[in-house]
Structures are given as C-alpha cells and as structure tokens.
Amino acid sequence: MDPSSFREPEQYSVKRNAHCPNSQFPVLVYRNVLPTPVDEESTSEFLQRNQWEKKGTWGAIMAKHFHPNTHECYGIFQGSSELVFGEGGADEVGTGVRCTVSAGDVVVVPAGVAHASVTSADDYKYIGVYPEGSPKWRSEYGKRTVEDDDPLLNEIGAVPVPVCDPVYGHQGPAVKIWKAIREF
C-alpha cells in the first residue's frame, strides 16, 4: 500500500466487565481501506497478503461472543452493520461500545473482546481472517461471571501480538499499538 494513502484506524477501548474479559488492546477500525472494486475476492486477496488467513464468509452474527484463543479481522465487502464491542450475552444492553461499519472497512478485534452485530443491512457480508498459525477460533458467549483467577484471562493474555497488521503489514497499527501496550 502506498504510504501516502495511510489512514490511522479508529480505536475503541473496552475494559473487562463482569461477563467479558475484553482486552487491554483496542479494537481497530480502518475506514474505506479495501481496494476497489470492493468484493469478496479483492478483499480476501488484500487481507491475506499480510499473513492473515481467510477462514470464512459471513453475514450478520447477532449472538454476542468473543474468542479467547485468537484475534479476528473482518473485511467488510458488502452492506453495512452496527456492531457492539465489549458487551457479553449476560451484560446489560448498552454497556458496550457501538460502531457502524460498511463496505470498504476493516475491523480488527483482539482476542477476548466481545462483539456482535446489533443491526445490519440485508446484504451485509464480510470475510473473517485470522493471524497465520492461529488455532481455529473458539467462541464464548459472556454468559457467566469472569473471576480474577479465570483461566480465560491467561489464555487471552497468551495470544501473541500479530506479526503483521492485516491492512498495513509489519509496521501497521495492530502491531505497533498492541506491542507498545503489551510492553508497557
């Protein structure tokens, strides 16, 4: 990607709550960064060139969930959706952070951060990519209390910072921002 086209991602921080570990790392939302024409094929090629693997294509997933064993990236190639971050299934509605995404946007969700669609256009579609070598995601639904000694916290903390940012590569925000936080 041409350095002159760099766009700083939006950052959404969500702290641990009673039912979701969430993460010390912010969710990153890159606006209108996918190549045109924005379609499934071009989105897949673009995100996979930076050592992230495509593992599926989905529409809206309304069930609030998080992955304790891997980071996840959405490449939105069609439609739009309002997402919620940081709010688990047992949390009071409105406790999370909301963000609307649309075709051309990329979202990077750190391991442990609850996420779901709240509303979506009928044609909303995205690909899911994961750092190369990551295990198959496992979903938790934020329906039980997370205690200080919960094994989920150690599992999430053991997920490595990605080698590459899915949009900008080795020196991209997911690498630089998250490494700085982890080293702090």
Model-predicted regions and their roles:
Residues 35, 88-90, 114, 122, ...:
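Residue-level signature for short turns and capping positions that connect secondary-structure elements
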Residues 1-64, 179-180:
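A short, N-terminal "cap"/entry segment at the start of jelly-roll beta-barrel domains
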Residues 62-67, 85-86, 96-100, 118-119:
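Short histidine-centered beta-strand/loop micro-motifs
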Residues 118-184:
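Double-stranded beta-helix
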Residues 69-87, 108:
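Short, conserved beta-strand element in jelly-roll/cupin
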Residues 101-121, 130:
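Conserved metal-binding segment of the jelly-roll/cupin
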Residues 91-95:
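Short alpha-helix capping/helix-loop boundary micro-motifs
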